[in-house]
């Protein structure tokens, strides 16, 4: 096993005192990345096996690398509400993840792990051994044929792990959808509705083209389209609604939302675990944000 290195988001590094800088957004979650150069080959990912991207990037975020020893020396859980571990499926990632979680498990901080689990047993082991609060099992691509093309694995098997994990760990499993990978609005709305039935929370991302990836020349989704998906998600999250109440054209584009109240200020905030803001993950500082980096309203306890 290689000597353990930990990558931390630049904003996390500023709060930890490792980097200098000023933050103009809420940042109650520490973001870490474990592993490097994935064994998988997702077309959009900077860490994909064949990607020629900067190894210190995930999406558009820079992740400064520090040693494990420097991390445990510098990390103060009192500065954060939650810590989120982004796990790259590289060789020996499980040993590196175990070491980090062993250090964190007795700290007074919520722990999230975002991972591509090998099987349900891996999910169960991480929850039971390390008392993690949440696990993100990212589908990314909600349409079956596109998923298998872009992510290179069987959709049904992955969905089985996702749904069965939620049955074992109710309200503790999240998944991600990346808007703009060729799917339709209908695909996304159907998926979010299906996840709600399985008590799985969906986090939305806007596709971000990264230099050196297979999809480096694919365009980002329009902000108008992304807002419609955010509003649709808000309606689904807060109401008992059916797919028939959404109006789509014959190409699967969302044309009309159901007649429910939408809290637009809340709907466009970053979606994810409690305390998650993911600043600039798929947003440029000088452009209108897809996801506003503010903490969503929730009930503590």
Where would I find each of the regions flagged by the language model?
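Alpha-helix N-cap and loop-to-helix initiation/capping positions
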Residues: 63, 150-157, 183, 187, ...
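Conserved strand-turn element in the central/C-terminal portion of the radical SAM core barrel
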Residues: 162-186
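Auxiliary Fe-S-binding modules of radical SAM enzymes
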Residues: 1-28, 77, 190-301
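Conserved Radical SAM active-site core
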Residues: 14-23, 32-146, 155-170
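Catalytic cores of alpha/beta
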Residues: 119-129, 181-198
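A short acidic, helix-capping loop that chelates divalent metal ions and anchors anionic groups
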Residues: 144-149, 211-215
